[in-house]
């Protein structure tokens, strides 16, 4: 109500009282213009303003839920490891970025899902965040100022010592005896039809590479419709993702000229001294992984040096109270943080759980155990935690070392953690028995709580949210068919055949997700509810971004069973890629796999060259090209040799 309408009631000087005031007010003449009346009016206005100010302050205190976090942030501003993450939108989507850029296997939750479930999750997350923030604030306030200062100084000293050691490490790499790689002779298949199909896949690689070279050379990825470069925020200012990711595919396919071009660019231009924030996971699997495999295949020293240099740059990500690394790292300052959307600032299982293979090889090639120690610390933390129903939630807080939201997935956010448990055991020449036990214990829990069979007989892997199942399976989850089959070798004899059959069932389900689309390429996610089976029902799940996981499973199933249907299914994918994804400027993902009219996303992902085309090429090659008895593929399809000569050393470290 306007203040002016009230003043005549209190400012009549003539003792006319309330009635007089009303009369004056209605008559339109404002009485009470004398000094005494002015003082009363002024006091009343000031009283109202003061009341409004008090109300505003109280409301701010009451309605700002993050005030305790603000306090915590101010007190800890000198300690990056304890500083809560700033509000930030992580690119386009989610494995944020994953939903649109297609590669952060663990980041699918950045995209909106079911509104009801999302609201409930958000409320639970808000309550959890508030409780955690209050606890942190209380703990902080209980500390004496000198204790806080001591903690800050200790952390600074630790960082300085680590940086000094890292510089010493990079100054002089020890000499290593390069062993000629096993199984890289690129012999032609005896069968003429298979030989012709393999040649076609090599031509696809040539088309993808030449257009990247023509329109986006030195940049991270290609926009094949626009015919220009494309860079995801996942890589910060680091350049050349496609060059590094494609190195081993070029080598394996015998594209020697292109391999030398890539090597020359890396030697001259690949620079990690950038002031930018990167995804530790993505940089590790693509850049570290690509450089390591290029070294092991070619013996070129530049690749070893660059891999170790980058590994050193990533070490500050581990400067957390628990040793669980941050998801994001500024390459210059060494300051890390987590994705803002990740369950109260948690680290993500598939991200911190997908460092083991690369970091073990970094220690092997550098002679410094620090890399192996970092990933073994992650395992120590995980083994001390209780697992709900034997399952590993997707979120773990790096400060408290405790689980975040209880969401379990073998697809986005969780997938490659399980893959790396199995492959850590295999890569150690089957001496890492701890990794083997963790893998089979996890698989048993997955079978009990997540694996289901539809009414139509399709086996699928659901997601687990606080004890409730969401009957959805992502394209990313389709890698698990190959994982189960590969793990059959280490299972008890009575279970080995079971795991081969389970892998075959997952392969069939994922093939059905392809076969039930118009373009014969699978959607980002597909569901088993409401009478629907292996079909995407939501528009934001109908896209295909040149992903490799289904073809990855075909490759393992072919190598382990030699059932000809896997080559048939792989060739169906080749024909679909050529019909619907190939354009003049390269290969593009699709926005909707259920419609006839192509709607391109205009991105040629680097993993299309690193994974999709490599797995297709291996399916139509003989088994002695990169034989599984000698090579382990990281989650970006970069082959690493099994560390046979390091058997005793690794066994001793991991006990």
UniProtKB/Swiss-Prot annotation:
State the compartments where it is located: Golgi apparatus membrane
* GO terms, molecular function: calcium ion binding; mannosyl-oligosaccharide 1,2-alpha-mannosidase activity
The protein in question is named Mannosyl-oligosaccharide 1,2-alpha-mannosidase IA
Cytoplasmic topological domain: 1-43
Q: Does this entry carry the keyword Transmembrane helix?
A: yes
Against InterPro entries, the record matches this protein to: 6hp_glycosidase-like_sf, Glyco_hydro_47, Glycosyl_Hydrolase_47, Seven-hairpin_glycosidases
Pathway per its UniProt entry is: Protein modification; protein glycosylation
Instruction: List the carbohydrate attachment sites.
Output: 515
Processing and modification events after translation: N-linked glycan at Asn-515 consists of Man(6)-GlcNAc(2).
């Amino acid at each position: 109500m306007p203040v002016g309408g009230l003043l005549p009631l209190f400012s009549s000087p003539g003792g006319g009282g309330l009635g007089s005031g009303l009369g004056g007010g209605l008559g339109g003449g404002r009485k009470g213009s004398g000094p005494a009346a002015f003082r009363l009016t002024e006091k009343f206005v000031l009283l109202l303003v003061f009341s409004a100010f008090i109300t505003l302050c109280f409301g701010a205190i009451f309605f700002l839920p993050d005030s305790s976090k603000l306090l915590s942030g101010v007190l800890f501003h000198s300690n990056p490891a304890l500083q809560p993450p700033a509000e930030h939108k992580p690119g386009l989507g989610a494995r944020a970025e994953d939903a649109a850029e297609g590669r952060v296997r663990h980041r699918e939750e950045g995209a909106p899902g079911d509104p009801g479930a999302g609201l409930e999750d958000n409320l639970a997350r808000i309550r959890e965040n508030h409780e955690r923030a209050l606890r942190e604030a209380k703990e902080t306030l209980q500390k004496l100022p000198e204790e806080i200062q001591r903690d800050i100084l200790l952390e600074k000293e630790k960082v300085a010592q680590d940086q000094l050691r890292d510089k010493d490490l990079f100054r002089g790499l020890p000499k290593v005896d390069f062993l000629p790689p096993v199984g890289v002779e690129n012999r032609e298949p005896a069968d003429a039809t298979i030989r012709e199909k393999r040649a076609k896949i090599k031509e696809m690689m040539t088309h993808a590479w030449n257009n990247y070279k023509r329109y986006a050379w030195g940049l991270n990825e290609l926009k094949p419709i626009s015919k220009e470069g494309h860079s995801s925020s996942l890589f910060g200012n680091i350049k050349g993702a496609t060059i590094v990711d494609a190195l081993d595919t070029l080598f394996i396919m015998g594209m020697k000229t292109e391999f030398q071009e890539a090597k020359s660019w890396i030697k001259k231009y690949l620079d990690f001294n950038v002031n930018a924030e990167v995804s530790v996971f993505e940089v590790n699997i693509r850049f570290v992984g690509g450089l390591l495999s290029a070294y092991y295949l070619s013996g070129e020293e530049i690749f070893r040096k660059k891999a170790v240099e980058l590994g050193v740059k990533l070490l500050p990500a581990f400067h957390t109270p628990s040793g669980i690394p941050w998801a994001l790292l500024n390459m210059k300052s060494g300051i890390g943080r987590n994705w803002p959307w990740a369950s109260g600032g948690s680290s993500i299982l598939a991200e911190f759980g997908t460092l083991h293979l690369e970091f073990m090889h970094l220690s092997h090639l550098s002679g410094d155990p620090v890399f192996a120690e970092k990933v073994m610390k992650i395992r120590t933390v995980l083994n001390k935690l209780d697992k709900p129903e034997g399952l590993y939630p997707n979120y773990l807080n790096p400060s408290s070392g405790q689980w975040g939201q209880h969401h379990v997935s073998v697809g986005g956010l969780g997938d490659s953690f399980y893959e790396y448990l199995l492959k850590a055991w295999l890569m150690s020449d089957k001496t890492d028995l701890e990794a083997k036990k963790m893998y089979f214990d996890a698989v048993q829990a997955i079978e009990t709580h997540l694996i289901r069979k539809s009414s139509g007989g399709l086996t699928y892997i659901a997601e687990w949210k606080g004890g409730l199942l969401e009957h959805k399976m992502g394209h990313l989850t389709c890698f698990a068919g190959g994982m189960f089959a590969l793990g059959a070798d280490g299972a008890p004899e009575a279970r080995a055949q079971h795991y081969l059959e389970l892998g075959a069932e997952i392969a069939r389900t994922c093939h059905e997700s392809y076969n039930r689309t118009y373009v014969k390429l699978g959607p980002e996610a597909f569901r088993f509810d409401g009478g629907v089976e292996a079909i995407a029902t939501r528009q934001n799940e109908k896209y295909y971004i040149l992903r490799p996981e289904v073809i990855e499973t075909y490759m393992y199933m072919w190598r382990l069973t030699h059932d000809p249907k896997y080559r048939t299914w792989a060739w169906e994918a080749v024909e679909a890629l050529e019909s619907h994804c190939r354009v003049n400027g390269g290969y593009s993902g699709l926005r909707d796999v259920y419609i006839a009219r192509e709607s391109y996303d205009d991105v040629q992902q680097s993993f299309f060259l690193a994974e999709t085309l490599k797995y297709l090429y291996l399916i139509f090659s003989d088994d002695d090209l990169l034989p599984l008895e000698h090579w382990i593929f990281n989650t970006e399809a970069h082959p690493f040799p099994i560390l046979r000569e390091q058997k005793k050393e690794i066994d001793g470290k991991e006990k």
